[in-house]
C-alpha cells in the first residue's frame, strides 16, 4: 500500500541535505531556525567549535503579544540585537528545511533590518 510521506520527515531530509553543504564558522556563524506549532526558536551557531553563540525564542520574557508571525519578527529582531552586541554581523541563514514563507520569512527579514547580513 502506498503511504504519504510524513511532512516532518521530508523537512528533516531537506535540512540534512542543506546542512551537508553549509556550516557556520566563528567569522560567519549559522543562523538556525526551528519552528514548532506554538513557538519559534533562533540560534546563531559556530559549527567548528560546536557552540551556540546567541539564541532567542518566543519563550523569552522580552517577547510578548501578537500573532505567531508578529512574534517571529520579534524573535528575529531580538536575535539580531543580541548578535550585534557580540559583534556578529555576517551569518549564514539556515531555514531548517522550512519553506521561506510566513514565520520563517518574518524572522529573517526582522533579523536583516536589525543589523545581520545574509
Curated annotation (Swiss-Prot):
Chain segments carrying region Disordered: 1-20
- An example Gene Ontology molecular-function term: structural constituent of ribosome
Q: Which UniProt keywords apply?
A: Ribonucleoprotein, Ribosomal protein, RNA-binding, rRNA-binding
Instruction: Quote any Pfam family the record assigns.
Output: Ribosomal_L18p
Q: Does the keyword Ribosomal protein apply?
A: yes
What's a BP term from Gene Ontology annotated to this protein?
translation
Q: Where is the composition biased (Basic residues)?
A: 7-20
Q: State the InterPro entries in the record.
A: Ribosomal_uL18_bac-type, Ribosomal_uL18_bac/euk
Q: Which CDD domains match?
A: Ribosomal_L18_L5e
| GO annotations of cellular component type | cytosolic large ribosomal subunit
Q: Does the keyword Cell membrane apply?
A: no
Q: NCBIfam families attached here?
A: L18_bact
Family per record: Belongs to the universal ribosomal protein uL18 family.
Instruction: Extract the HAMAP family matched here.
Output: Ribosomal_uL18_B (MF_01337_B)
Its recorded name reads: Large ribosomal subunit protein uL18
Native organism: Pediococcus pentosaceus (strain ATCC 25745 / CCUG 21536 / LMG 10740 / 183-1w)
